[in-house]
Amino acid sequence: MIIVMREKATEAELRGVIGLIRRLGLSERISRGVERTLVGAVGDERVFEPRSFEALPGVEKVARIVKEWRMISREARPQDAIVTVRKRRFGEGRLRALRLKGAGDDPEAALRLAARDPDLGEPAAFLAEPFADALRPYAPAPDPKAARSEAKSWSERCKASGIPVACRIRNLSQLEFALGMSADVIYVAGDALNDLDMNQALGKLNVPLVLCKGPQHTPEDWLVAAERVALRGNAQIILGDEGAPGRLGPRLDVEGIAFAKAQCNLPILANISAFSAPNANLSPRALARIAFEAGASIVLTDPERRQAKPESGGQTDQPGFPRPRQQ
């Protein structure tokens, strides 16, 4: 059961709701949004009488939701949630870009270069990769110490320039470093989506998050993980899509993005960096447009993986998407 407080509900009114929940033998989970606070009642809901809560001061409505994602659901809060990072608002209906930091870049030079990018223009934030691994078995492994030192230095220079920085982590042991470098956003790779300890730790933070699903996950996995984080109190969640299985490798998960957009109110990021390599045959601009129309309001791009033009007649397709038939 979800109790939605009014926009200007006071702390005293919130305590009144919590008191009634506890008197019924239930426990509460609180999620504080920018405009409204949601209170989840956890326990045997057979003792729950919605009208007794609707009569309390400060309560806007009570919603009985049976799905596994409740705090983040459209039933609890129909309007889109907004996540604000250094005065930049994510999720308000305009497309924004999060851009991977290029090797050797400095923030101001990267911004000047990105502003001339004909595909997506100036990024709203940069993504640092202090824990990047070599995916190819015979590729030289990155120097972990150097990568972390560079990420810290980059973060400090970005802050001096007023540019938000996200830090990508892949497991719970890396969270402390990301917090230590004062990242504006914690970007959690799909590897950690179903890590319960990670979900609980993220929920206790007061830091914006990008919570990613990988090709091995379902959209339901995505929403359940976000709900676990929200139940711990952190409502600053952006859903991140790292693709779905395709015939030639991961593809943009248009169906998953559309499903999540319909089911929950959280902003959605589509990682199109893996799909803008030459063998994808779609430009970053085209992929971003597809993602935006599916429901994503943020895209992650990689300036070092530029799109090559198709060699045959300008025809384009994407791995996992059928090529249009010739007439």
Feature locations, PLM:
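Short, acidic/polar
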Residues: 49, 106-117, 170-176, 283-288
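Active-site mouth loops of central-metabolism enzymes
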Residues: 93-113, 166-168, 274-282
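Short acidic amphipathic segments
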Residues: 50-65
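N-terminal amphipathic alpha-helix/helix-capping segment at the start of soluble metabolic enzymes
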Residues: 69-105
